[in-house]
């Protein structure tokens, strides 16, 4: 299936929706401006998640869900994902034969039943939105650029390549994986910026200079933002020290087995690597790999390539995250836009709280915003 729908997820395909994503970013800035004007502490981490959900809605379905506009957890999706994710992580890591046992046996456990129902609520949304898209004329669908329309066009153009259930599953996965991964990354970026004021100052200076010399314009284009060296270094380093997806990514040893670092693995052995471990490898990232230091990404092109090759935040090889272009577009567009307009500070001196449930969920990212005088 991945090969069939792959063209819908290319960077070129994603950026056809950049104008619509700009509207989500601008609405988000208006909401953040309200918090700045009120001078009130607010849950910045939750709002970053709401932005991520609306970004997914816009690019995948053609319009935002309404999280930002209505200032609510639209449809209870955030609560549903957070409730379902611990169960999903257990099911995903369990052997195939054990998965139905966990799901069906869990119905008798209130917490697990609640998680199953929460996940099913998102599935029903995916089905409903797909049915609406199917009701459009074929000609109308072919002119649209959202990913759902692109996938439905592929289904029509290549009979037998996809079932409608395949489309439902694809959209269900997009809502869950596309939102939590990006919001987790954004929370990490801003958390580490706030914890390292010198890094924040340097990045803001780069953004201001880019606007002054015209290399950044409004709205910020993804093609412009990725050329900012220090912005890229900050995002890369944040993803390195705190990857939003941190579980072993299982693979099976091939026929005949193989040897890795002096250890023989027989055929069929299940093995995996965790980004949270790999991305702290001192041989690749340096003796100070435990530290948040974006400057390591600026030391040389060769070192950048070596470190980037070792990053597992979006997976690797044929199993690279298919939605990574959307996630990166949201990050590279919204981070400089926020820092151009606002000074962001933690509202307390407490550390954030984290919980790993496949996606690492962070909380207690409570902030205050102040409009910048030169905004």
Curated annotation (Swiss-Prot):
<comment type="function">
    <text>Cytochrome P450 monooxygenase; part of the gene cluster that mediates the biosynthesis of the host-selective toxins (HSTs) ACR-toxins responsible for brown spot of rough lemon disease by the rough lemon pathotype. ACR-toxins cause uncoupling of mitochondrial oxidative-phosphorylation similar to that of classic protonophore. The structure of the major form of ACR-toxin (ACR-toxin I) consists of an alpha-dihydropyrone ring in a 19-carbon polyalcohol, a typical polyketide structure.</text>
</comment>
<protein>
    <recommendedName>
        <fullName>Cytochrome P450 monooxygenase ACRTS1</fullName>
        <ecNumber>1.-.-.-</ecNumber>
    </recommendedName>
</protein>
<dbReference type="InterPro" id="IPR050121">
    <property type="entry name" value="Cytochrome_P450_monoxygenase"/>
</dbReference>
<keyword id="KW-0503">Monooxygenase</keyword>
<dbReference type="GO" id="GO:0004497">
    <property type="term" value="F:monooxygenase activity"/>
</dbReference>
<comment type="pathway">
    <text>Mycotoxin biosynthesis.</text>
</comment>
<keyword id="KW-0560">Oxidoreductase</keyword>
<keyword id="KW-0843">Virulence</keyword>
<keyword id="KW-0349">Heme</keyword>
<dbReference type="InterPro" id="IPR002401">
    <property type="entry name" value="Cyt_P450_E_grp-I"/>
</dbReference>
<dbReference type="GO" id="GO:0016705">
    <property type="term" value="F:oxidoreductase activity, acting on paired donors, with incorporation or reduction of molecular oxygen"/>
</dbReference>
<dbReference type="InterPro" id="IPR017972">
    <property type="entry name" value="Cyt_P450_CS"/>
</dbReference>
<feature type="binding site" description="axial binding residue">
    <location>
        <position position="321"/>
    </location>
    <ligand>
        <name>heme</name>
    </ligand>
</feature>
<keyword id="KW-0408">Iron</keyword>
<dbReference type="GO" id="GO:0005506">
    <property type="term" value="F:iron ion binding"/>
</dbReference>
<dbReference type="InterPro" id="IPR001128">
    <property type="entry name" value="Cyt_P450"/>
</dbReference>
<keyword id="KW-0479">Metal-binding</keyword>
<dbReference type="InterPro" id="IPR036396">
    <property type="entry name" value="Cyt_P450_sf"/>
</dbReference>
<comment type="similarity">
    <text>Belongs to the cytochrome P450 family.</text>
</comment>
<dbReference type="GO" id="GO:0020037">
    <property type="term" value="F:heme binding"/>
</dbReference>
<dbReference type="Pfam" id="PF00067">
    <property type="entry name" value="p450"/>
</dbReference>
């Amino acid at each position: 299936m991945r090969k069939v729908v792959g063209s819908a997820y290319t960077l070129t395909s994603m950026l056809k929706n950049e104008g619509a994503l700009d509207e989500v970013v601008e609405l988000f800035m208006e909401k953040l401006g309200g918090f700045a004007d009120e001078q009130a502490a607010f849950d910045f981490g939750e709002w970053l998640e709401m932005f991520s959900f609306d970004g997914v809605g816009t690019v995948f379905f053609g319009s935002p869900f309404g999280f930002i506009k209505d200032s609510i957890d639209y449809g209870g999706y955030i609560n549903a994902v957070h409730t379902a994710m611990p169960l999903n992580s257990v099911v995903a890591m369990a052997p195939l034969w054990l998965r139905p046992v966990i799901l069906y046996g869990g119905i008798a456990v209130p917490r697990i039943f609640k998680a199953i129902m929460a996940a099913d609520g998102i599935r029903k949304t995916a089905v409903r939105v797909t049915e609406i898209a199917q009701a459009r004329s074929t000609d109308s669908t072919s002119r649209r650029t959202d990913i759902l329309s692109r996938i439905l066009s592929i289904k029509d153009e290549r009979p037998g390549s996809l079932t409608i259930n395949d489309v439902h599953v694809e959209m269900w996965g997009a809502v869950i994986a596309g939102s939590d991964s990006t919001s987790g990354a954004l929370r990490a970026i801003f958390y580490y910026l706030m914890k390292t004021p010198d890094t924040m100052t340097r990045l803001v200076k780069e953004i201001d200079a880019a606007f002054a010399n015209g290399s950044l314009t409004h709205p910020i284009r993804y093609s412009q933002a990725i050329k900012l060296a220090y912005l890229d270094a900050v995002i890369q380093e944040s993803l390195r020290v705190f990857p939003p997806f941190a579980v072993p990514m299982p693979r099976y040893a091939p026929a005949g087995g193989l040897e890795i670092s002096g250890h023989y693995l027989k055929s069929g052995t299940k093995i995996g690597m965790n980004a949270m471990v790999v991305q702290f490898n001192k041989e690749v990232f340096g003796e100070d790999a435990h530290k948040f230091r974006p400057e390591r990404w600026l030391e040389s092109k060769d070192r950048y390539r070596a470190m980037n090759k070792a990053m597992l935040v979006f997976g690797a090889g044929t199993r690279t995250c298919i939605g990574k272009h959307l996630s990166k577009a949201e990050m590279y567009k919204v981070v400089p836009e926020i820092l151009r307009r606002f000074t962001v500070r933690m509202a307390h001196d407490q550390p954030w709280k984290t919980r790993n449930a496949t996606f690492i969920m962070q909380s207690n990212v409570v902030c205050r915003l102040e409009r910048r005088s030169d905004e």
